[in-house]
Amino acid sequence: MITFYSPGAPGVQLESGTSCAELTAPAVWIDLFQPTTDEEKALEAALGINIPTREEMQEIELSSRLYKEGDSLYMTGIMVTNASSDNPTSSAVTFIVMPNRLVTLRYAEPQPFVSFRSQRQAHPEFYRNGHDVLAGLLDAIIDRVADILESVGGSLDRISLRIFDAEAPDGGSNWDRQPQKGKSGRRRRQRQGDFVDILRRIGCTSDLVSRARESLVSFARVVAYYREMQHENPAAREALVHLKTVAGDLGSLSDHATFMSGKISFLLEATLGMINNEQNGIIKIVSVAAVVFLPPTLVASVYGMNFEVMPELKWVAGYPFALILMVISAVLPYAIFKRKGWL
């Protein structure tokens, strides 16, 4: 699908029977969304440029993402899509800056494009040429990444509360701070289930932050390349002034994303430490059982050998004596270990 945007006019889609050249002439922004081969050929003929293939857009070499052909600049950035879901994705978007218009090529519907279309419809007088459109799109993209990082920050705060069993903002608690008697087993099972969910959420958050950082890095290069190539172009003067601010925002957001990556690493290590602590508690229970039952088992084994010469076998109080000895051998080691603080 190809949509043509002329100054101060709504978008017009290319339909069968419509001349692509007629729609191209007044347009300052041409948006290609999942174009067909015929649409690409028609636009290439009308503009006299080469439209990159989807495979070429995915190439990671810098020379494949930022280059110049004739009077046109080709710049490809990575955008985060489906950021609100548990399965965010990344999609390449190519910006072709021509002397009098902007061509965008994409195979996804990122939120910034939706936001920018609404912004353009509300203030059409701000976007009189392709450079202004590019500046507006980049501004919308940065705003979206900032929103994603803000959302991630809130998610990390909630994850931190769950990990460290802190008081929730609403006055409640994710886990009982003081386990009630007789409910430690159920509480442990609840915590184990929570840890599994926490690990999953940390993984999803880490993936989203990684994609956001990739997007920020790619658009930092796009902005730097555009400013370098257009610094002497009078038509791009206003866009260059605005993109100077955008470049600063990109740097600050990249620093914030780096901070969040460090926080994610800390929370992951803390979660694994909590899981290890829970496992140590289980091992401790097994150790207590071994300390308590091993001595009585030894006593029972001695008196269960059934040798003929065993005085206790003919002793009337032999059986009670053995039982009392087994109880003492169980209680005494437990009391000693407890006093020493080993249990």
At which residue positions do the language-model features occur?
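Peripheral, non-transmembrane regulatory/ligand-interaction domains of membrane transport proteins
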Residues: 1-229, 234-236, 245, 249-259, ...
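Divalent-cation-assisted or electrostatically stabilized phosphate/pyrophosphate-binding catalytic cores
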Residues: 239
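Hydrophobic alpha-helical transmembrane segments and their immediately adjacent juxtamembrane loops
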Residues: 248-343
